[in-house]
Structures are given as C-alpha cells and as structure tokens.
Amino acid sequence: WIMGHMVNAIAQIDEFVNLGANSIETDVSFDKNANPEYTYHGIPCDCGRTCTKSEKFNVFLQGLQKATTPGDSKYQEKLVLVVFDLKSSSLYDNQASDAGKKLAKSLLQNYWKNGNNGGRAYIVLSIPNLAHYKLITGFKETLKTEGHPELMEKVGYDFSGNDDIDQVAKAYKKAGVTGHVWQSDGITNCLPRGLDRVRQAVANRDSSNGFINKVYYWTVDKRSTTRGALDAGVDGIMTNYPDVIAVVLSESAYKSKFRIATYEDNPWETFKN
C-alpha cells in the first residue's frame, strides 16, 4: 500500500492517486464536544508541505465517497484504503467513546450512505493515544445500534503513538479487538528514525501468536529510506511523494517481491509468503 500522506482537501485525492497512491491518510480534528470537525493537520507539519489545507469533515467524506464508488464520475479504482489520523489528543480521555460514536455516525451518513451503495474503501481508524481505546468501542457500538454492524468488516485499527508493542496489545485487549490491526511506526519527514521498532512489529506480525496483521512506516520521501522499509518487510509506506515509492517498487530487487495492492487484497489478512 502506497499511502498518500496528509490528504485533507478533496482536490488532493485525485492528485495523490494520480501519482501512484492506492491509499490516503487524512487528518481529522475534533471540536470540544468530540464531534469530528475538519480534515486538518495544522502547523507544524512535514517539511515541504502546506499544513493548512482543510475541508469540513462531512464534506470531505462526501468527496471521498464519490472517489471510491464504482460508476461515479469521480471514481478512482485504485484507491482502496483510507487511514483517518484521528487528532484525538485535543480531547479529554473520557471523551474518546463519544468521539468514536460521532465519527461512526458521520461515516455512516456521509461515506457509507447508510449502507446504500456508499464508498467501498477499507478504513483504518488511527488513534494517537492508547488511553483512547474506547474510541473503538464507541464506534463499534454505534454501527450496531444504527443497524449496520456488517460495516465493521471494512474497518481496521492503528495506534500511532510509537508505543511499546506489548502496551499496544493490552489496549486492543481492553477494546475487544482481535483482528484488522495495522501497526504504524514513524516520524515526520523532517527527522530521521531507525527501523528497530518496525522490525519488532514485523516480527510480531509474522509470529504464530502475534496480534498485528499489517505494518506501515511513515513518512518516507526518499528512495534510500523506501528501500530500507521494504527490506524490513513492511506492508505499507506513507509518503508525500507516491511516485518515489512507485519507482523503487519497480526496481529489479523489489518488483518480484512486492506489488501494489488492489481492492481484491484483504488489508486485514496477514500476508503469507
């Protein structure tokens, strides 16, 4: 999965997919009542990027829905996975469940169209704080009460705080999560970061009793870093330059080992060689 980083305006969806992304990451900011409000990152952000592009969250979802619904004039067949980077650190811990509930309602109405031919992309809820695990339970409960528990088949999870992997496992246990787990590792492109924790996550993914299904590394803008991440065995790379990742994937060392994921590739299944 080539994951376009910080795609917060509808116009950027086409821009990143046309550069080779089959996945995008979108920032979600919340108001003080835990309502998802804007697709917005803010300052500071990655070096070389504008930090302030935004849409109202529900408006962005409507644009995203069009981009991921076959038959729509804006349909982008290659776009199969969306990571919502939930900026829940602005909330009190006891608001996490409410944030999950409100996020689910928003997606249900504006993206899934209440289960009536909505967008088809798989969704990852990426949470920055292990203490906010109730965001997951609130989200799940709401889809159930609204009569659409089947949509949870399209939803996966990530804790993005670079926490100790054992602690991440405990948070999932509390949330009742037993699958659909993506594990991120990374840092802004302005700073270097080693691959030690990525390797730990990959080892967990590939062990018989691991809880991780997929591992992605962020934010990667250079060919050399891309090669390092691929050598470590990641499933996804988040980038500001999807075309850079695509070029490396076409190199002889990688083209026989990796390919770009399509809609037929289940993002919740651990890949077995």
From Swiss-Prot:
Family annotation (Pfam families): GDPD_2 (PF13653)
Keyword NADP recorded: no
Entry cofactors: Mg(2+)
One GO process term, biological-process aspect: killing of cells of another organism
SUPFAM superfamilies, alphabetized: PLC-like phosphodiesterases (SSF51695)
Compartment(s) of residence: Secreted
Top EC class, one word: lyase
InterPro entries: PLC-like_Pdiesterase_TIM-brl (IPR017946)
Binding annotation for Mg(2+): E25, D27, D85
Main location class: secreted
Cofactor note: Binds 1 Mg(2+) ion per subunit.
Residues annotated as the enzyme's active site: H5, H41
Gene Ontology molecular-function annotations: lyase activity; metal ion binding; phosphoric diester hydrolase activity; toxin activity
Disulfide bond sites: C45-C51, C47-C190
EC number annotated for this UniProt entry: 4.6.1.-
GO cellular component: extracellular region
Organ and tissue specificity: Expressed by the venom gland.
Keyword annotations: Cytolysis, Dermonecrotic toxin, Disulfide bond, Hemolysis, Lipid degradation, Lipid metabolism, Lyase, Magnesium, Metal-binding, Secreted, Toxin
Record-linked Gene3D superfamilies: Phosphatidylinositol (PI) phosphodiesterase (3.20.20.190)
Biological role: Dermonecrotic toxins cleave the phosphodiester linkage between the phosphate and headgroup of certain phospholipids (sphingolipid and lysolipid substrates), forming an alcohol (often choline) and a cyclic phosphate. This toxin acts on sphingomyelin (SM). It may also act on ceramide phosphoethanolamine (CPE), lysophosphatidylcholine (LPC) and lysophosphatidylethanolamine (LPE), but not on lysophosphatidylserine (LPS), and lysophosphatidylglycerol (LPG). It acts by transphosphatidylation, releasing exclusively cyclic phosphate products as second products.
Family indicated by similarity: Belongs to the arthropod phospholipase D family. Class II subfamily.
Protein name: Dermonecrotic toxin LdSicTox-alphaIB3ai
Organism listed in the record: Loxosceles deserta
